[in-house]
Structures are given as C-alpha cells and as structure tokens.
Amino acid sequence: MMNWNQLISAKRFGMEEFHEERQENRSEFQRDYDRLIFSAPFRRLQNKTQVFPLPGSVFVHNRLTHSLEVASVGRSLGDDVAKALLERHPELQDSFLPEIGSIVSAACLAHDLGNPPFGHSGEKAISTFFSEGKGVRLKEKQPNGEQLSPMEWEDLTHFEGNANAFRILTHQFEGRRKGGFVLTYTTLASIVKYPFSSSLAGTKSKFGFFVSEEESFRKIATELGLILLNEHPLKYARHPLVYLVEAADDICYQMMDIEDAYKLKILTTEETKELLMAYFSEERQEHLRKTFLIVNDVNEQIAYLRSSVIGLLIRECTRVFLDHEQEILSGTFEGSLIKRIAERPAAAYKHSVEVSINKIYRSRDVLDVELAGFRIISTLLELMIDAVTSPEKTYSQLLIDRVSSQYNINSPVLYERIQAVLDYISGMTDVFALDLYRKINGNSLPAV
C-alpha cells in the first residue's frame, strides 16, 4: 500500500545531495510550475498542432493553450482532492498534502512536452518509420557490427510522447545540468501515465519511459514508494496523482475540441448545445435555458455551457478519486477516473467522444494536417537516420551539422545517435519542421 507521506516529496531529481529548505514563499512544487512555464520546450508548444491546423482565421487551441487549460483544471482537481483528503486524514495536515493542486498543475503543464510536431500523426510517423518504413533495416545487425537491443528496438517501434516527455524532463543533454529540468520527484512521477517499459506497450503503443531512462524512473519510484508490479520488464503501479493529471487532460481535450469544432463550423450551434446540455439533469437543463433568455449571445452561451460541463466533470472525477482512494493507493484501481463518473455525464461524454471521432477528427482539414505531417516527419527521419548511420557520406555531415550541440549526434552508440535524431525532430515546431523539409527538398532557400 502506498502512503501519502512518502508519495509527496520535494526532493529534486539530479540535486539529491544539494537538497535544502529555501527561504522563500514559493513551494518547491510552485517552483516546478514556474520552471516549466519559462522553459523553451514549453514555449515551443505554441506552434505545435493540437487537433486543428495552425494558424487560421479562427484561432483554435494549440498544444500550449491546451496545456495551460489542463493545468488550470488540474489545479482545481488537486485542490478539491487535497481538501477532502485532509478532512479524512487530519494527521496529514503538516505534510505536503495541501500542495496537491500545485503538483498536479505543474505535471499538467509538462504532460505534452514530448509530443512531436503535427499532433498524433507525428508520433505515428516516428513509430511506423521503424516498424514499417525504411527504418526496419535497423533491427538487424549493421555492416559495422552495431546492433540495437530488443528493448531499444521496442522503444523505437512504439515511440510515445509521454515517454519522450519524461526523457526531456530528466535526461542530461550535452552541456546541460544533471537531472534535466531538476523537477521534484513527485511532479515527475505524476506525468508518467504508463509506468512500464516499451516491451509491455502492446497494440496501443503506450509506455512511460525509454530504456535509457529506466533507471531514472526506478530511482523515482523507489523513493516515492510506488508499488513494483514486475521486475523484467519493469512495471510499477501509477502514482495516485497521475489519475488527476489524466482526468484534467480528458476533460479539456474533449470540451475544447467541441468548442473549436463549433468555431470552425464543423458542428452547428444546435449540435454543440445538444452535446453539452446532455451532461445535465432535466432540472439543470431548464435552469440553463432560462439563463439563455438573459444571455442571448450564442458564443457566450456555448462558453457558459462548456465551463459548466467542466465544473461538473471536475466534481465527478474528484468524487471518483475519493471513493476509490484505497484502491488507488493499493495499485488495484483500473481504468481512468472519467470512466467511473455517474451515468448521465458518462453517457454524454461517451457521445461527445463518438461525435469527435466521426465529425471532428475525420474532417478534411484535420486529415490534411495528419497526412502532411506524416510525410514531413517521415522524410526528415529518413534523411537524418541515414546521416547518423552513414556519417562518412558528405551529405550526411551537412545534415549532422544542422543539429544542435545539446544532442549527442556523434555518439559511438547507435541507439544514442538515433535518440539524438528523435530528440531533435520531436522538439521541432510544426513551422520549423515544414521549413526544414522544404529546404532539404530544394523547395525553399534562405533569404539572401
């Protein structure tokens, strides 16, 4: 059984021997939040696709605005859960339990840092390059004798943004300090939705850390008392706060995708209202209709409905977490919080997901971005991987010289060189990736 006193630690990854209490008003977890907000990888999220093409005449969500909204919802979830837990466990009043809102909020900011350009099509382009594309050749022993281990190969064929985020936050890149972002152990553990290695990824290609960061996660998990479920391959029970980060993400992406689809006229006003009203009881729906007689601006009505649904889902997910606290602490809770909410909102949420799949994610604009992104990422990967596996070629060196010095592109280890390419490409914005693709293909030249 995990316990709250051990689960919430202010110890910083990479600075364990230097840990000391700071004389300032900010808590260590608020420092995590601020450190993320001011980081370059976080800023780059403003030019990474969430779902819809960027930018357009109608401003829609990108990865940055999405992450900020998830952090806001995550803070509310964390604060509500902390308040209830302190009433339930008054002996924890002097612990870090009141900081749950700050921890979840910081973890929410970081949850998408590892996503490559062009949304999920970028992730798919990377994994399929190795499983189906020209990267397949790397599974075999190379002419110079280099060979990837089975676990390294699993990492590549199941490339996952969540695992990549953990790498960005913890890996010591060239010329950078030990511990990556040097975040607290608890914030780091709270972003790992799938706390197991890639060999357990299965058909959904979900896992929490690459083999290169396995020992880092093991260190964090041991410190926080996460339950070890399997040694080889490595698998732990989730940190309890992961459920709150996941719930905040589930709430936001579903609500914001619907709102964006409405703004882009993929969904009509009536369709949007119907989707959102379905979350509420008949009595509450009647109250909302009366409110709309006063607030007759349609956009304001949709925004009010959206915020009301978010409030409802926060209360529901908080209730589910508290109802199942013991299962969560024992590592036996299965599924997500959103899947355990009350019947009416659960049915409305399920219907929202179905509409999103059928009408939003399959809309022409969304598919066009996915197709273009897949092509761009695949091409960049093909050229860059060829460069690091055949560096003796003249053209290879030209490509290698483009890569930032923080990436270990000249490592003597094949896996590390491939990872350096993935670090470089996954860190690109949509615009940077497109610009590089055009230049490499001779479709664009630098202005003189």
Model-derived segments and spans:
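Substrate-recognition/cap regions that form aromatic- and gly/pro-loop-enriched pockets
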Residues: L322-S404
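Sequence-structural signature of the catalytic-core scaffold of metal-dependent phosphohydrolases
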Residues: M1-N25, I37-K48, S57, L68, ...
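A short small-residue
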Residues: K48-V58, V355-I360
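Hydrophobic alpha-helix feature that most strongly marks membrane-spanning transmembrane helices
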Residues: C252, M256, D260, I314-Q326, ...
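Hydrophobic (often cysteine-bearing) scaffold residues that line and stabilize catalytic clefts
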Residues: H66, F118, G122, G161, ...
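Low-complexity, highly charged intrinsically disordered N-terminal segments
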Residues: H61-L64
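Acidic, low-complexity proline/glycine-rich segments
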Residues: Q30-R43, I341-P345
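C-terminal amphipathic alpha-helical interaction region
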Residues: S390, T394-L445
